[in-house]
């Protein structure tokens, strides 16, 4: 059989093009059962759909013995994360908060009506976190990842930055006289490999770290 049309339904937050670039079942190609299962695994690993509900609807084309249509009915799930935590360590309370947006769309930042609640659709990830004990320690981190840099090939781009500050003012009424600060940035590129299978990735990163005493 030859694949005639490939349809997608059920995606309200993720753009069609983002899903289609992950499909191994494409119009004009021969129907292949192994590529069908590979597509199911890939869609399930994206983290935006109910993996157990991914089941392609394969229908023969009317008046044809050689063509089939494949429709992918998808069930979206919440993929963003908000984390808040607290604990006791080193004789003090430590709190942390973080938010991760897993379906960001940078290209829609200035698009009218896109902020509902933020521009989404391109499967880009933005993560922001902060940690402090309220007195002598605080840390911040931010990272951004585009899994398909430029939208043409599955080459990922990641950029991140972090900052931490620790001093010897162990109580709120004290003034620190010594400190240890770190700041750093990093940028990395990832390339999806075909061998030994499409789930292997080569990743290279360059980073800069500064220590201040």
Give the residues covered by each predicted segment.
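Solvent-exposed, non-transmembrane alpha-helical starts
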Residues: 2-7, 153
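N-terminal periplasmic "start-of-domain" segments of outer-membrane beta-barrel proteins
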Residues: 13-27
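Generic structural signal for individual residues within well-ordered alpha-helical segments
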Residues: 7, 20, 37-40
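Gram-negative/organellar outer-membrane beta-barrel architecture
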Residues: 13, 29-213
């Amino acid at each position: 059989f030859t694949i005639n049309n490939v349809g997608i339904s059920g995606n309200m937050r993720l753009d069609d093009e983002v899903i289609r670039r992950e499909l191994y079942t494409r119009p004009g190609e021969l129907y292949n059962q192994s590529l069908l299962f590979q597509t199911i695994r890939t869609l399930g690993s994206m983290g935006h759909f109910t993996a157990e509900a991914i089941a392609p609807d394969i229908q023969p084309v009317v008046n044809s013995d050689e063509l089939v249509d494949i429709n992918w009915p998808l069930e979206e799930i919440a993929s963003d994360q908000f984390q808040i935590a607290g604990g006791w360590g080193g004789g003090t309370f430590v709190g942390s908060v973080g938010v991760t947006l897993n379906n960001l769309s940078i290209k829609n930042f200035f698009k009218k009506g896109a902020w509902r609640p933020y521009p989404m659709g391109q499967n880009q990830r933005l993560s922001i976190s902060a940690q402090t004990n309220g007195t002598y320690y605080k840390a911040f981190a931010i990272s951004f990842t585009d899994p398909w840099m430029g939208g043409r090939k599955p080459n990922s781009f990641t950029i991140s930055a972090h900052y931490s500050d620790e001093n010897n003012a162990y109580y709120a009424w004290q003034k620190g006289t010594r400190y240890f600060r770190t700041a750093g940035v990093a940028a990395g590129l990832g390339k999806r490999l075909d061998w030994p299978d499409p789930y292997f990735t080569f990743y290279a990163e360059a980073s800069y770290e500064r220590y201040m005493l």
